[in-house]
């Protein structure tokens, strides 16, 4: 399955007591299908993967594959700090039916660029799934350089990158690597429209948890080079781009999900949205239904 358009980095709904909320998860999957997204990510950073037990990871991924697998890609977050553990987690995701592994640069350990190349080649060779690289230095402390990506893009089982560094120079460098065998995806909602217009393949989004149709519409218009309509949709979504960054992800988007009846709180060490942002969350939640309705016209 190709990787393009809008892919939602799914949040993981929990109940008020902190337990996994399977009913909320099913409602979130339904919302994404209704919104026409082109793929989903299960158990990434937005999904609070670091807080999940193995049993919870299995339940989330297996149920997502059962509900939407075969229709759109179901990517699984499998990146961990060690190579052997990442391979093991990738094999686990393959056995559960994931279409791709989204593999973040190893957090905390800060490998060299040569170390990244060796790490990703090992995962691609031994993990059993097509690998999508994921660069988000603000979270991991490790910035995978375009030259490193170029080295990895030639591997037949490394099929794309989610790049969360949204600056123009980085996007241009990665565009040179784009091919039918290697997709370039934005990991930054706020700069995605500009990047897609420049030629990248799509967006792995946080905001589309609550606005799948609206973010899909923005991505489709950007890919079609309808500049005026793209700018109009990007402007409508700008308050959501901004709000999702007022506190560490996924705190803000989970506050919005709670306001539309999906899930409750987060797991420690993340805390619920600060009271100073509640009014903004209430206001934005009130706009969601109208924006989703408009996106279908």
From Swiss-Prot:
Which catalysed reactions does the entry list for this protein?
L-aspartate 4-semialdehyde + pyruvate = (2S,4S)-4-hydroxy-2,3,4,5-tetrahydrodipicolinate + H2O + H(+)
Q: Which residues cross the membrane?
A: none
Any one Gene Ontology molecular-function term assigned to this protein's record: 4-hydroxy-tetrahydrodipicolinate synthase activity
* Organism domain of life: Bacteria
**Which positions are annotated as binding pyruvate?**
46, 204
Amino-acid biosynthesis listed as a keyword: yes
Q: Where is this site: Part of a proton relay during catalysis?
A: 45, 108
Question: Residues in the active site?
Answer: 134, 162
Q: Name one GO biological process term.
A: lysine biosynthetic process via diaminopimelate
| Alphabetical UniProt keywords | Amino-acid biosynthesis, Cytoplasm, Diaminopimelate biosynthesis, Lyase, Lysine biosynthesis, Schiff base
Keyword Secreted attributed: no
Quaternary structure (record): Homotetramer; dimer of dimers.
Family (UniProt): Belongs to the DapA family.
Q: Tell me the protein's name.
A: 4-hydroxy-tetrahydrodipicolinate synthase
Q: Which organism is it from?
A: Stenotrophomonas maltophilia (strain K279a)
Coding gene? dapA
């Amino acid at each position: 399955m190709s990787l393009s358009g809008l892919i939602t980095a799914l949040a993981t709904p929990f109940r008020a007591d902190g337990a996994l909320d399977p009913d909320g998860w099913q409602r979130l999957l339904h919302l994404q299908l209704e919104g026409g997204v082109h793929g989903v990510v299960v158990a990434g950073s937005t999904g609070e993967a670091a807080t999940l037990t193995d049993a919870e990871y299995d339940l989330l991924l297996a149920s997502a594959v059962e509900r939407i697998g075969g229709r759109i890609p179901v990517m699984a977050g499998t990146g961990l700090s060690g190579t052997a553990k990442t391979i093991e987690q990738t094999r686990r995701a393959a056995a559960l039916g994931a279409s791709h592994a989204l593999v973040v640069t190893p957090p905390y350990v800060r490998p060299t660029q040569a170390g990244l190349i060796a790490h990703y080649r090992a995962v691609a060779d031994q993990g059993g799934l097509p690998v999508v690289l994921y660069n988000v230095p603000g979270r991991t402390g490790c910035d995978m350089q375009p030259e490193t990506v170029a080295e990895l893009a030639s591997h037949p089982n490394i099929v794309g990158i989610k790049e969360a560094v949204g600056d123009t120079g980085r996007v241009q460098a990665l565009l040179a690597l784009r091919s039918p065998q290697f997709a370039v995806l934005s990991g930054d909602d706020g700069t995605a429209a500009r990047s897609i217009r420049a030629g990248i393949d799509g967006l792995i989004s946080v905001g589309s948890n609550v606005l799948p149709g609206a973010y899909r519409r923005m991505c489709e218009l950007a890919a079609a080079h309808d500049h005026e309509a793209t700018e109009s949709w990007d402007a409508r979504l700008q308050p959501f781009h901004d709000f999702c960054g007022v506190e560490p992800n996924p705190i803000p988007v989970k506050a919005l999900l709670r306001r539309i009846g999906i899930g409750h709180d987060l797991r420690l060490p993340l805390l619920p949205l600060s009271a100073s942002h509640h009014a903004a969350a209430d206001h934005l939640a009130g706009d969601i239904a109208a924006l989703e309705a408009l996106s279908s016209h």
